[in-house]
């Protein structure tokens, strides 16, 4: 659960906050309750008290136009409604009654010199990533030709060896063994590596390899968008493998269908070349070029002409 103190600490470089009141409530939770990040923070809104309230110059001018009694009434309703925090943008100085009420209700009140619109934009981006649905999957995540590729399969099939071969061919490692995936936008899944395993690749017989040290800075990536899953299967698993799928195979990942390719592992097969070919073919499909569909149309035309 994200707290106000975490929000302050995580954004210290971009948004310098100063505590005014309610510091004892620094551990107050910021709950998403299924809401989008855009709904978790915004300009002062008395109708939606459950989001982070931002006071800009216009909001503070509107608030101070009320008499003291009416201000206290509205603010009491807002604070009792479960507001996570109140943020004053543009370096504004709050009226004393606002400070007193935040202290009384133990609601964090903070100030920052950042402009209100910029503050909201920065926090929406931050909250969208921080509160995004996440999962951890077993596999190797790579940047292959600019496409985020997740290699999966049962243990012992050579996922790490395949990743090492692809890295030696100029592609980049994102994560090995434990891949953290986050749905940061409605149609975007980002994958990254846990801090503990960054730059490391485990290969049977060699142990842990520091890819960044061995291959250089350009051999690793911090994050990539997941676009393709390459699933390795044993050559004996005929019941799980379709030689020529007529429809694209997809796998559900955090509620999104991700394109999936299945490759058989057998002696003499160059899997690195096959993965590169699968990625190039996926790029063509993303551009609207369907090789199998074009072939089937060509075949239908040939059958039609031969029947005349």
Curated annotation (Swiss-Prot):
Gene3D superfamilies: HprK N-terminal domain-like, P-loop containing nucleotide triphosphate hydrolases. Residues 201-210 are annotated as: Important for the catalytic mechanism of both phosphorylation and dephosphorylation. Its cofactor is Mg(2+). It comes from the Bacteria. GO terms for molecular function: ATP binding; magnesium ion binding; phosphorelay sensor kinase activity; protein serine/threonine kinase activity; protein serine/threonine/tyrosine kinase activity. Mg(2+) binds at residues 160, 202. One of its GO terms (biological process) is regulation of carbohydrate metabolic process. Its EC number is 2.7.11.-, 2.7.4.-. It holds the Pfam family Hpr_kinase_C. Catalyzes the ATP- as well as the pyrophosphate-dependent phosphorylation of a specific serine residue in HPr, a phosphocarrier protein of the phosphoenolpyruvate-dependent sugar phosphotransferase system (PTS). HprK/P also catalyzes the pyrophosphate-producing, inorganic phosphate-dependent dephosphorylation (phosphorolysis) of seryl-phosphorylated HPr (P-Ser-HPr). The Walker A ATP-binding motif also binds Pi and PPi. NCBIfam families: hpr-ser. This is HPr kinase/phosphorylase. It comes from Bordetella pertussis (strain Tohama I / ATCC BAA-589 / NCTC 13251).
